[in-house]
């Protein structure tokens, strides 16, 4: 929208400023950790998983109105492969079940003539990204305000991602770690503006990947980051990711997002519902609103800034759970 109205320069300029904004407010924003007891955390993480599942279903059907039998077969075989690996294997093989499912599913699709290799053929062998490739940034006030609002929404969503990872890895999430996470996102957004690309935020889909793989240390992430940098310099290899058929990807996503939902439910199982009926209200309202409003057109008549807030199910669930918990449980301590 910014690019259409003010040009690409204004869009990238707004990205740069919003990245700086996230870095500057990260310290203040990180103080929200105490607002996330188990009832809030469980509700938010459950909502993350449930709002992502329709994305997986759409991909399984190749995102068309009338999915073909081939699409359904590829999605089902991918899910089956991942399940069999998780049931009958252990250790390293089990941890890469998603990768194996994607590779085997893509190979089967290729044997059926459903894989388009043209992106690999069209990609250059080597490409070095250059700053301001599409022109110098322009700093237009309304675009900057809009992008800072979007960045704030992303920070709320990322908080839910950090909470989910904290529960999976059993690592405590304090204000310092939250601040560092926000700063990393701000730096990524800033670099995105400098290199004329997209803003980068915490990817909630990866929570399921962490849960399913069982990898809970940061070292593999460093290796993966280096590998992605290499792929960015060698576009032909990077283009290989583009040839994965949507149904195959959807099958893998279905398993991952299901894991995210269950992770949230496990947290809710630790909440005291028996002696505190208010917790029922908090979980019920926040999850129902988050799942129901995600991507809906209910607020299309409102200004764009409000639409961005209220059409993001994770943000809605987070805000509702925090506010309801603060009101209903303000004089109760979490056990």
Identify the role of each PLM range.
Residues 1-75, 243, 247:
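Early transmembrane hairpin of solute transport permeases
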Residues 94-179, 303-306:
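Helix-loop-helix hairpins and the membrane-proximal interhelical loops
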Residues 17-26, 43-57, 74-88, 99-114, ...:
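Hydrophobic core segments of alpha-helical transmembrane domains in multi-pass membrane transport
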Residues 58-67, 116-134, 237-243, 297-308:
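Membrane-interface helix termini and inter-helical loops of multi-pass transporters
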Residues 21-34, 82-90, 159-168, 204-212, ...:
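C-terminal ends of transmembrane helices
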Residues 39, 68-76, 94-99, 243-254, ...:
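Loop-to-transmembrane alpha-helix initiation sites
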Residues 4-7, 30-38, 67, 206-224, ...:
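Transmembrane helix-loop boundary segments of multi-pass membrane transporters
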Residues 146-218:
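Membrane-embedded helical hairpins/re-entrant loop segments and their flanking transmembrane helices
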